[in-house]
Amino acid sequence: MAEYCAAVPQTSSAELSGLLRRYYQDSGVRKRMCEFLGGTDLKHATALYIAGTDGYSDYQVQSPPTDLIEYLEGALEVDRSLWDTQSLIADIDLEYHNFDYPAAPWRDPARAFQLQQPVLDATLQILGKAGIAPLTLVSGRGFHLVWAVLRKSGAFRHLARLGRVPASLKSRNAQACAPNGASVDPDLACAFSGLGLIMEFVGHLVLEASMERCLLPVQPAAIEVGPGIYGREIISLDLSEYGDSLHTRHVRIPFSAYLKPRQFEWMFGESEVRRLLPIFEIPLSDMAPAQAITAMRDPDAVLEIAQHVSAAIPDQSEAMEELLDNYEHSELAIFHDQFYMQLREGTSLPNCSIPTPPCAQFLLEKPNDWLLKPAALQHIVRVLTAIGWSPSSIAHRICASYSKDCDWGNTWDRLEPCSRAIFYTRLFAGMIATGLDKLIDFNCVSHQEKGYCMIPDCSSNLILYRDMLLGKRKST
């Protein structure tokens, strides 16, 4: 694997903090951050909150946007909430994952970004056909494509009509969810749910368009695969943010430092982390990705970009209408309607003569933290669909596992179990129903390679379950 950072001098933690404090004093950087927060100044920002981290953990403190200067003086990485007072913020998260060598995209960014190019091209082409021109941000492992739908627009009302919010999430949204004590408006929660359906539709189109052109598996979340020469690596068009509550999700602010390598200091050492940083989040603008991955590691180059490249989130309300129309005439929309109809009507567990294989039963009985992982949820949906469970029954079964007393800690303070079970069941069952899931890795060897086979000596053979699914597909 190429050593992109081999010639980069090491920067100590104290030196990096000093560099970031000086960098953050730049008026151009602060101006662009305010743009992304939705205002000309921090007092008029439309983002509900910002969140900062020193990079060493996932923990982030939420504060009002007016606290931005304090965060910058602390040399932090800074995010903004997807939750906004004026708009529904859409975000597509595209990135390279290597489950065996997490440092791979930082040590050899040229390779990681080149591998993503077919997926980025497909995403921009599909959005472009609908007239959507997002703000494209370059991050440490990939891209964020961000745009806004004004809450006063017809597209927002259309999304709100499409959205389905479970009663448990409605109750959660009614509580104080922001630093200022605000709760999530019901219409906004419905629109965010509707946006999740549209993003799932976009995901289907992108995966279908790019899977033959991309050298790596393209997944709708961080789903492990079998190993290749460079380890278990994928390109993820990550839809997982639409399975969580709106108030919990945020996106890194352009021109913020990118400090995620610090999370892995325990794995590859302090000296390696020093070699990898600094990295900054920047708009792609008119640069090629190869230019961007060089510029984002050079503070002076980033400061120059901040002088002339806007970070305002573009309003794409009108263009969203065409994407909505395309979705409503799709096979996926039909599946979604049937899925939610089953959920409303209620469902009983099927009488199955075919046993659930031990690997799936293990995941259901040990949900913490197995059923917090997308690959495990995909496996459950595949197996139970094969033996005759309806998608709504599967969602109820996963939710029942989430309800077990399994030392969850504060997990369900941050996440909402019912909506999470519904989202991942819908996502993976929809891929089966439309034929997007080719089931190539639905076998015992692949399951072992992914790291999810906890009972290797069982007598079950997942090929039999895959054949059942393929048989169902041929008969429909």
Question: What feature does the model see in each segment?
Answer:
Residues 139-147:
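Short, conserved phosphate-binding/catalytic loop or strand-edge motifs used
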